[in-house]
Amino acid sequence: NFYHIDRVLEAMHEAGIAVIVGTPTYAVPAWLAAKHPDILVTTVAGQQKYGPRQIMDIVNPTFRRYAEKIIRTLMAHVQHHPAIIGWQLDNETKHYDNIGRYMQEGFVRSLQEKYPDLRQLNHDFGLDYWSNRIDRWQDFPPVENTINASLACAFSRYQRQQVTEYLAWQAAIVREYAQPHQFVTHNFDFEWRGYSYGVQPRVDHFAAAQALDIAGVDIYHPSQAHLTGREIAFGGAITRSLKPGQNYFVLETQAQGFAQWTPFPGQLRLQAFSHIASGAAMVSYWHWHSIHNAFETYWKGLLSHDFSRNPTWQEATTIGADFARLSPQLAELKAENDVALLISNEAMDALNHFLPGDARGNIYNDIFRRFHDALYDHNISLDIIHDVNEETSRYRVLIVPGLYAADEGLLTRINDYIARGGRALIGFKSGFSDENVKVRSSAQPGVLRQSCGVSYSQFTLPEETTVSSCCAEIDCRNDNQAELWMELLTPDDGTRTLLRYQHPAWGEYAAATEADYGQGRALYVGFLPQKGLISQLFDVLTADLTLNSRTSAYRYPLVVKKMRNRAGNNIHFLFNYSGEAMDVVSETLGTALLSGETVYVGQPLRLRAWEFTIIES
């Protein structure tokens, strides 16, 4: 029964509103779960009971059969409607911690293909430990209770691969019906801690995006006095890199949202243009009006429950008007960053499998956010990448936080990048284990010792430990706490010690070092620094470089972004991420797009609370 879909499509078309239709596979109906209860996903907590959305087993053949049927039926019904410009695959797809029969059987088959000889599997994964050795494939144990990080991380990688396959499967069906002018997209999301927090552990965004024409994303974040723009920045940097050279769609972001998110005046505009400044070509809200029942009753939309106009809706109308007016200048913006940050789902899995001390949760994302946010606050604009290859040579600086698990090829490419003139800021635990989470038997940081010029064999937890500067360029008296982990570093001959531990037992060891390697330079940090110290280390590493990514001499809460538009002009965004007015001077000559006035270098500018300006030069 497509009555409501037809009604909405006709209303949108009559109003001149374009439509993206989503495949309806992320929430199974009650009758289907009752008829085929095996389609409900099994996790370590057991088979899920019907109620929430996204509790289906995406590799279950019965679920796939019904999913294909509804996709094809829907597509055949609406494919020619003139309002439709594109198709969204599913919704924030993940594997939902699936450990069910079909997932585990598929995993074992994948290992059989990779390891015709079980002895090699046992060797690579170290399965002799605690008698975990597997001598016959039919003896392969359930994966969910394994004590072996190599096996657990391999299964996690396989689970992510099934998300990639599932989205590609849907895309192939949709493209059988899609018109030539219609695109295929998907709304990726991130690790959730009440808002978008970090790299998504359950999806390989870079692999899954290959099935799409345009990458899409959902970004939610703290608001009111806690609004920083950091989530918009990292979310945009990841999504911008999924389809290189293309812009992306913000398919969901908050309008009013939760009660604690109700935006202060001006914040909705600030958020929307921050998305544009990261490379978004669309900003759309979840959702239009606030719903009156069920789980998301208090996840409010642009309109409140009374459907009447309100300040958030009114502010959104100004955003739409400015988007329409300024599209010639702001459409198809491109980043020209020369700083990149490397992320890895495999390193995340491995690092989180061995939590130090009393650490809990996804510490990889804590580390990622510490490095990203430090540079964001420092007005260093960056791209986020997932590999180092020939394309990486266009970046002058590479940030490598927590690359705990990596094959020798990736680490060698990092060394080669440095040798050819690159600068690298490499974080603790990088290079420690191979791609199978087997710790390297060489001096650490393994292959990276060659470029970093430092080694260690011991490490501990930084209890009552600070660091002190060994060079005039660093003043860490206000940011001297060593956190989470500390490696007892010994510099090679010719390697400079930048920081040293302040502790009665560990004072002889370096905490951060810098070494020349080939034509480049590597800075290695053996602990988790505070944000202010990370920015100082970055400045030391890049002191003699003029970086396009260094967008301003100002610091957070004045956030400055720079993009290139299709006319070849620079677009400078100056965002005041604070509740107080800010007086600055212009760092560029150009035209203020919102007012049309000419702005001169050195001209005083006042930005009210949560206000921004855009200058074309």
Regions found by a protein language model. Give the residues of each.
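Carbohydrate-binding surfaces of carbohydrate-active enzymes
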Residues: 140, 168, 180, 209-617
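Acidic (Asp/Glu)-rich catalytic clusters
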Residues: 11-14, 78-79, 205-210, 238-244
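Polysaccharide-binding and catalytic clefts of secreted carbohydrate-active enzymes
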Residues: 34-37, 41-232
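Short glycine-centered segments of the SAM/dcSAM-binding site in methyltransferase folds
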Residues: 18, 183, 423
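Aromatic-lined substrate-binding rim segments of carbohydrate-active enzymes
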Residues: 1-45, 170-178
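Aromatic- and glycine-enriched glycan-recognition loops and surfaces
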Residues: 1-13, 69, 162-169, 230-234, ...
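Short, solvent-exposed turn/loop segments enriched in Gly/Ser/Thr/Pro and often Arg
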Residues: 22-31, 85-94, 187-192, 252-254, ...
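Short, solvent-exposed loop/turn and secondary-structure capping segments
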Residues: 24, 30-34, 97-103, 196-197, ...
